């Protein structure tokens, strides 16, 4: 990506987010890779990316921070990412279970009642695998196509007549509270979340000795 942008536009990145296989939502890995996550040398990939971006930092005389994402749960994970040479981390799932998150209470409750056993990899209508909570909706779309009554034009090449379901409607329904009849994306460590807290307390827990 850096090479392409440098060649075509003489521009480089402001920062790089490296998302690993434990992330929630759509994943940049194949189903086969995700079935053998332990075999993915994610640490090695991070180190290679950090080494690669140095060339472009020198060429453009700017710092390009590397942010690690996907499955970052606690201070131990943050410290590990920083030890690899990353400049920071990106965390999503843990902030869903906060009072400040604008998702419905039912959506947050689905997170804190999740277990490792009911988190699975699904095939999204966009053609990528994704990680989500198993619910009635997931069970239904495994059995049959759900008719699409309205197109939100969110994907250029989406055909409402052919897709198994409308992912936009499924995501909106879930976040608004219909968690059994919508799509609840989540990270691999969501089963470790057991309470709804505040952003302030969560930041204190995550930063702690790192400050």
Give the positions of each predicted feature.
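Conserved active-site-proximal phosphate/metal-binding subdomains
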Residues: 13, 21-67, 73-211
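Short amphipathic alpha-helices and their capping/turn segments at secondary-structure boundaries
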Residues: 1-16
């Amino acid at each position: 990506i850096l090479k392409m942008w440098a060649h075509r536009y003489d521009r480089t990145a402001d920062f790089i987010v490296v998302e690993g296989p434990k992330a929630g939502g759509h994943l940049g890995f194949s189903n086969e890779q995700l079935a053998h996550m332990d075999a993915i040398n994610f640490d090695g990939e991070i180190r290679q990316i950090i080494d690669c971006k140095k060339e472009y930092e020198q060429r453009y005389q700017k710092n390009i921070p590397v942010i690690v994402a996907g499955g970052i749960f606690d201070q131990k994970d943050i410290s590990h990412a920083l030890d690899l040479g990353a400049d920071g981390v990106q965390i999503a799932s843990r902030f869903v279970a906060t009072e400040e998150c604008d998702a419905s209470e039912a959506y947050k409750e689905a997170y804190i009642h999740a277990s490792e056993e009911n988190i699975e990899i699904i095939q999204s209508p966009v053609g990528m695998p994704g990680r989500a909570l198993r619910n009635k909706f997931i069970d239904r779309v495994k059995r049959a196509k759900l008719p699409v009554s309205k197109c939100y034009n969110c994907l250029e090449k989406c055909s409402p007549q052919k897709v198994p379901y409308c992912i936009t409607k499924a995501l909106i329904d879930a976040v608004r509270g219909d968690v059994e009849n919508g799509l609840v994306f989540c990270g691999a460590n969501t089963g470790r979340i057991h309470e709804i807290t505040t952003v302030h307390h969560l930041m204190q827990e995550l930063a702690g000795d790192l400050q």
